[in-house]
């Protein structure tokens, strides 16, 4: 079997499993057919009649397919081989697999109040037989990318392939998170942003998400993300939906904040003018 056919066949197995797995958290019929190792058959961990659980699961189900699509489109933009485009889709497919068990058990997507969903996801897929159909290098790449997709910074590595796929999934994920969060974007409640967050924003740095103290801190974190976007293609997708300016419009604009906002706008203009290069 040619590599293209092998990867497509493997993709079919993975996508069918993932589709069934996601639906098993809110579909009784699907749950009865679930594998025992998924640990979702117990009445203590499954809530078909709980609107909060069902809404949260469906939200992440849609997010999963959106991110998978983003991975595919970004991979094609970067002119990856057909093999690597398929690998990028697989990473997108499983990047948030830990979210479903997390939300059902803990009723939160907040890792600080539950478990690191990336690490939880790696546990969920660890024993899936079809994972062994990937080459050792591809499997290691997939695990590294998923394990680092939500990290503040990517784990140090000399492996350019690991690093490049981690960058790809982080971009694909962020593009859709902006979409997910947009309906919840509200005007400033007057509490403002924490001074240390504003300082980091002005410097173009990332922050420790666990230290967010106000609603405006959360908005500022989304603006700081721009400096962590790896490809101009990704940033263009975000800017075209007006996500950045929408967030800016919901913050107070004192002199210090405007320094950060003006720097951000200049950075965006410069980043969009760059050419994307795949280094993996």
Segment roles from a protein language model:
Residues 1-119:
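Acidic/His-rich, divalent-metal-binding segments that scaffold phosphate/diphosphate chemistry
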Residues 43-66, 133, 137-154, 158:
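Amphipathic repeat-derived elements
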Residues 10-17, 29, 34-43, 148, ...:
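Long hydrophobic alpha-helices with heptad-repeat/coiled-coil character
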Residues 79-90, 130-147, 162-168:
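Acidic/histidine metal-binding catalytic segments
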Residues 2-6, 56-65, 69, 73-81, ...:
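Divalent metal-dependent phosphate-bond-processing catalytic cores, especially two-metal-ion Mg2+/Mn2+ enzymes
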Residues 72, 119-129, 144-147, 166-170, ...:
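A broadly conserved amphipathic alpha-helix scaffold signal in soluble, globular proteins
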Residues 100-141, 152:
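Hydrophobic/aromatic-rich structural module bridging two neighboring secondary-structure elements via a short loop
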């Amino acid at each position: 079997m040619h590599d293209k056919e092998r990867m497509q066949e493997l993709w079919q197995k993975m996508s069918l499993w993932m589709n069934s797995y996601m639906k098993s958290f809110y579909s009784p019929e699907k749950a009865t057919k679930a594998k025992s190792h998924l640990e979702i058959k117990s009445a203590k961990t499954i809530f078909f009649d709980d609107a909060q659980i069902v809404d949260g699961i469906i939200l992440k189900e849609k997010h999963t397919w959106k991110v998978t699509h983003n991975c595919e489109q970004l991979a094609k933009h970067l002119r990856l081989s057909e093999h690597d485009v398929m690998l990028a889709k697989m990473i997108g497919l499983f990047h948030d697999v830990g979210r479903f068990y997390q939300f059902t058990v803990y009723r939160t997507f907040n890792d600080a109040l539950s478990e690191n969903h990336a690490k939880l996801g790696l546990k969920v897929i660890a024993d899936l037989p079809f994972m062994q159909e990937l080459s050792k290098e591809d499997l290691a790449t997939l695990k590294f990318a998923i394990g680092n997709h939500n990290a503040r910074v990517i784990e140090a590595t000399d492996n350019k392939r690991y690093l490049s796929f981690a960058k790809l999934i982080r971009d694909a994920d962020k593009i859709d998170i902006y979409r997910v969060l947009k309906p919840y974007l509200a005007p400033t409640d007057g509490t403002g942003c924490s001074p240390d967050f504003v300082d980091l924003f002005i410097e173009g740095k990332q922050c420790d998400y666990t230290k967010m103290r106000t609603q405006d801190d959360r908005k500022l974190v989304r603006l700081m993300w721009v400096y962590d976007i790896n490809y101009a293609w990704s940033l263009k997708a975000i800017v075209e939906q007006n996500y950045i300016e929408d967030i800016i419009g919901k913050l107070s604009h004192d002199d210090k904040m405007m320094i950060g906002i003006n720097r951000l706008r200049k950075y965006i203009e410069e980043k969009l003018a760059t050419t994307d290069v795949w280094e993996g």
